[in-house]
């Protein structure tokens, strides 16, 4: 009895508060029991007595008894991904952090369990279904009408209340509900923008932050994404031209890419990568550009692009379509498009027309960023013309000097958030920023063992000085996957065992 009293007195109040704020639960894909909670937040922060929105979160308790009081929060990307849906994939990467720290997954308003603003998931649709800009805009208009009638929304204008600034106020409400004085943030892609906004709003509550694939608040995604995607594609083409093995197998790769674009649109047939059924459809530049952009995120998939582009130029489209599907099919890859547009139309939309170049790409303009800019720019320009836009404070676009240590991670081959974005964010953050670039990595570095170790040592360091001084030389050893080479036939059969050897094996 006395031991129980002493033990109870030893437990910090924050842990007791965390237990009271959550209840045991299960998350699909996570083997063990976790704890789930919810905070009730006003839909419109200016009307605290108005309709409320439930912000759901999951806490994965630390393994060790002597836990540390500063949990690690994951901020998902997209914008529009569910952090809770990513838990099964992320927890193995956070295993060392989870030894002594709770890991917290918060579904940002508009995602996952927190009033998901989801449109129809078209990722696995039939190849014959229209996939062009006109079809996508029509689908988004229909989605807007449906979302406007979804509780707790009262009208389409309520989609204005899903901006990053409001979401980070929700996140701090979760922190307070758990009783944590300070927290660590790990943001990925758009999650880095969210982390920067949390740091701006609540610097005193932030202990450390890791930004994986830095997306600055003033980055205009449709424009920068087009430029950076083309740069990543050009780097892949140049790498193949410089590689004796790739050049020998694909001597006309750049010409194949240009001739493929120049031949579009055209009627084709191909086997669907998921169903295996042959479908007849019109292949256009929008579908090809989207199919190429996805694999560029992961160098292991991009290694298959030389073969896939060459095959497509010769009329066989299954390899290219299959590569695109490989990325789209990953766990947690679904994006709530309603939330996605509510964020980007409010935060990027006002700057889109200013930064979007004029002119068209032309069929063979593979050496300019125009094709990829046109692909995203047209869609966002037209969608944001009718999508409700929230209010964004001017201070949102300015990154202030960091009050705590911040680790910025970039992949040199990233088609979405390459190092150039982290460069200027690091300059703005000042002396408390540490930037690490992995030259041969793509979008999202946490899956690399060396980087996971860096992240753990950065967060676990006793003070900011030691955190900023971690040794990151291991990143130079990360290789770029060589271009995929198909098998040139079956390997030779193994020789049959002799009769005496067969008798011995039988015994």
Regions found by a protein language model. Give the residues of each.
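Short helix-capping/linker segments at secondary-structure and domain boundaries
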Residues: 296-311, 350-356, 463
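Charge-rich, solvent-exposed alpha-helical interaction surfaces
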Residues: 256, 260-263, 291, 308, ...
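Long, low-complexity segments enriched in small/aliphatic residues
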Residues: 317-353
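Gly/Pro-rich cap/lid or specificity-loop segments adjacent to the active site
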Residues: 17-287, 342-344, 348-507
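Short, solvent-exposed helix-helix connector turns and helix-capping sites enriched
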Residues: 243, 312-320
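Structural motif
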Residues: 272-291, 297-301, 331-338
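Bacterial N-terminal signal peptides
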Residues: 2-13
């Amino acid at each position: 009895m006395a031991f129980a009293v002493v033990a109870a007195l030893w437990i910090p109040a924050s842990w007791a508060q965390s237990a009271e704020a959550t209840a045991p639960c299960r998350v699909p894909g996570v083997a063990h029991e976790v704890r789930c909670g919810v905070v009730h937040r006003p839909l419109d922060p200016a009307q605290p007595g108005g309709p409320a929105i439930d912000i759901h979160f999951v806490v994965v308790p630390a393994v060790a008894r002597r836990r540390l009081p500063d949990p690690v929060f994951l901020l998902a990307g997209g914008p529009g991904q569910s952090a809770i849906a990513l838990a099964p994939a992320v927890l193995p990467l956070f295993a060392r952090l989870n030894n002594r720290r709770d890991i917290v997954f918060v579904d940002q308003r508009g995602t996952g369990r927190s009033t998901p603003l989801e449109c129809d998931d078209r990722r696995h649709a039939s190849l014959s279904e229209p996939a062009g800009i006109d079809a996508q805009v029509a689908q988004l208009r229909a989605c807007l009408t449906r979302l406007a009638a979804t509780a707790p929304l009262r009208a389409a204008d309520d989609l204005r209340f899903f901006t990053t600034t409001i979401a980070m106020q929700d996140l701090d409400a979760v922190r307070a509900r758990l009783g944590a004085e300070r927290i660590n943030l790990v943001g990925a892609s758009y999650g880095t923008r969210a982390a920067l906004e949390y740091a701006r709003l609540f610097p005193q509550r932030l202990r450390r932050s890791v930004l994986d694939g830095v997306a600055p608040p003033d980055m205009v995604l449709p424009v920068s994404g087009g430029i950076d995607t083309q740069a990543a594609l050009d780097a892949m083409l140049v790498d193949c031209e410089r590689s004796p093995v790739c050049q020998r197998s694909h001597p006309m790769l750049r010409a194949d890419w240009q001739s493929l674009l120049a031949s579009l649109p055209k009627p084709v047939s191909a086997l669907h990568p998921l169903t295996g059924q042959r479908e007849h459809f019109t292949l256009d530049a929008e579908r090809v550009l989207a199919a190429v952009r996805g694999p560029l995120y992961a160098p292991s998939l991009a290694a298959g692009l030389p073969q896939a582009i060459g095959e497509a130029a010769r009329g066989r489209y299954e390899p290219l379509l299959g590569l695109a599907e490989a990325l789209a099919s990953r766990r947690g890859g679904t994006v709530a498009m309603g939330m996605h547009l509510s964020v980007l139309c409010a935060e990027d939309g006002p700057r889109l027309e200013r930064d979007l170049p004029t002119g068209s790409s032309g069929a063979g303009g593979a050496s300019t960023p125009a094709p990829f800019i046109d692909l995203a720019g047209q869609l966002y320009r037209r969608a944001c013309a009718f999508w409700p836009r929230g209010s964004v404070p001017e201070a949102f676009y300015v990154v202030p000097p960091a009050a705590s240590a911040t680790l910025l991670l970039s992949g040199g081959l990233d088609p979405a958030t390459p190092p150039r974005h982290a460069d200027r964010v690091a300059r703005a953050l000042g002396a408390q920023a540490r930037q690490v670039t992995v030259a041969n990595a793509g979008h999202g570095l946490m899956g690399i063992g060396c980087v996971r170790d860096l992240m753990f040592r950065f967060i676990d360091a006793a003070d900011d000085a030691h955190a900023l001084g971690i040794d990151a030389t291991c990143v130079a050893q990360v290789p770029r996957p060589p271009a995929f080479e198909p098998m040139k036939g079956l390997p030779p059969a193994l020789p049959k065992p002799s009769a005496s050897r067969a008798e011995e094996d039988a015994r």
